[in-house]
């Protein structure tokens, strides 16, 4: 089950939805107002939740509730600032930082010292260590290697626009990340510029910078090694 359709503004649930979900038009995350279908899917109300929370985990609910699904493990040193929803059978790694507005689906793995802010992480996605994922969507079964960065702010401080099949959309958002399609695989230190879309089943080699929307395919940098000192 995809989370994003449950989180979009009501007017985006029409019979003819856009080809690319307008992920920046999410409703504010209020965990106790999620639909019962979504709560059941994420196993938020399971009778035996068996959630494992290690020592020195900080859960801050001063700005919103933090709800965790069954059989999820939160490792040593992680910080979670509500409102946040984490589904069932997830692993939140050591010193991960989960910031407000984030909703994480079932079976997700978050690596060491990764920071996630105001993002939707769909089922069975894997996000490696030391990543920064902000104002973005990571779709089902996507894999992000270490130190992947989603840029969410333009240097000229202008609102972020998104190029879609319907045309260029002025989102009005000062901060907006990217949409990473299902089963995409991103190598170490990939950087995605604000408002970009990566199509499903795309593979990006290490250190690729995503400056434009990418159709499905395999991409890598061309490298030239020069031997010197002889």
Curated annotation (Swiss-Prot):
MF-aspect GO terms: acyltransferase activity; nucleotidyltransferase activity
Claim: Ribosomal protein is one of the keywords in the record: no
SUPFAM superfamilies: Trimeric LpxA-like enzymes
Annotated EC: 2.3.1.-
UniProt keyword list: Acyltransferase, Repeat, Transferase
Family: Belongs to the transferase hexapeptide repeat family.
Name of this chain's protein: Uncharacterized acetyltransferase YaiX
């Amino acid at each position: 089950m995809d989370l994003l359709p449950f989180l979009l503004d009501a007017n985006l649930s029409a019979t003819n939805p856009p080809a690319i979900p307008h992920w920046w038009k999410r409703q504010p995350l209020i965990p106790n107002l999620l639909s019962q279908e979504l709560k059941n899917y994420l196993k938020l109300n399971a009778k035996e939740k068996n959630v494992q929370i290690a020592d020195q985990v900080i859960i801050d609910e001063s700005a919103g509730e933090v709800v965790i699904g069954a059989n999820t493990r939160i490792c040593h040193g992680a910080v979670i600032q509500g409102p946040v929803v984490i589904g069932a059978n997830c692993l939140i790694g050591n010193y991960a930082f989960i910031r407000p507005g984030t909703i994480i689906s079932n079976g997700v793995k978050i690596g060491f010292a990764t920071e996630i802010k105001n993002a939707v992480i769909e089922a069975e996605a894997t996000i490696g260590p030391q990543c920064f994922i902000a104002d973005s969507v990571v779709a089902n079964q996507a894999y992000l290697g270490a130190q992947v960065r989603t840029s969410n702010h333009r240097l000229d401080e202008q609102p972020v626009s998104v190029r879609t099949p319907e045309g260029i959309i002025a989102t009005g958002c000062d901060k907006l990340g990217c949409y990473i399609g299902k089963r995409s695989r991103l190598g170490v230190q990939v950087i995605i510029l604000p408002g970009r879309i990566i199509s499903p089943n795309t593979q990006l080699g290490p250190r690729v910078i995503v400056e434009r929307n990418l159709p499905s395919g395999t991409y890598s940098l061309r490298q030239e090694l020069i031997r010197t000192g002889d």
